[in-house]
């Protein structure tokens, strides 16, 4: 089970660690914007897209909704600019048999980050600021 050891021993970059909150959401189909929302300055409908992520050194990722309720406590691995998220380490090791989700860090500065997820002809982008 060398791969599990490699995942857990790979250092998580310091600039990714900590809490991040959503500030913008974009949903595109076939490259056309369907939804383009400024989450923090919007109305209650816009705030449904708000969440907070926390990345830790032990390859755990936590997600909370706008009310502070925890949505998940999962594992992640980083390969280049791709973050793969799964329910546990086994799911990361055998993604073909389990549900995983991969997001790409498409833009990153010290205090902001954009994560993009593509599935078929649909693209979702969340912009985060460090919390």
Model-derived segments and their meaning:
Residues 4-5, 28:
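Enriched but not universal
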Residues 5, 73-82, 112-131:
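Edge beta-strand at a domain terminus
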Residues 5-21:
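N-terminal helix-cap/turn-to-beta initiation motif at the start of protein domains
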Residues 19-31:
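Short, solvent-exposed beta-strand-terminating loops
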Residues 20-22, 37, 66, 75, ...:
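Buried hydrophobic residues that stabilize the cores of well-folded domains
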Residues 26-28, 48-111:
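Contiguous, well-ordered beta-strand patches that form the walls/edges
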Residues 29-44, 91-94:
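Flexible, solvent-exposed loop segments that connect beta-strands
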């Amino acid at each position: 089970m060398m791969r599990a050891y490699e995942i857990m021993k790979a250092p998580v970059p310091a600039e990714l660690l900590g809490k991040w909150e959503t500030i913008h959401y974009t949903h595109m189909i076939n490259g056309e914007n369907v939804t383009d929302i400024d989450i923090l300055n919007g109305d209650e409908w816009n705030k449904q897209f708000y969440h907070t992520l926390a990345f830790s050194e032990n390859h755990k990722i936590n997600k909370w909704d706008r009310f502070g309720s925890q949505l998940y406590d999962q594992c992640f691995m980083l390969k280049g600019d791709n973050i793969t998220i799964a329910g546990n380490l086994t799911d990361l090791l055998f993604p073909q048999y389990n549900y995983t989700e991969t997001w790409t860090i498409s833009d990153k500065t010290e205090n902001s980050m954009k994560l993009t997820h593509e599935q078929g002809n649909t693209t979702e982008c969340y912009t985060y600021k460090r919390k």
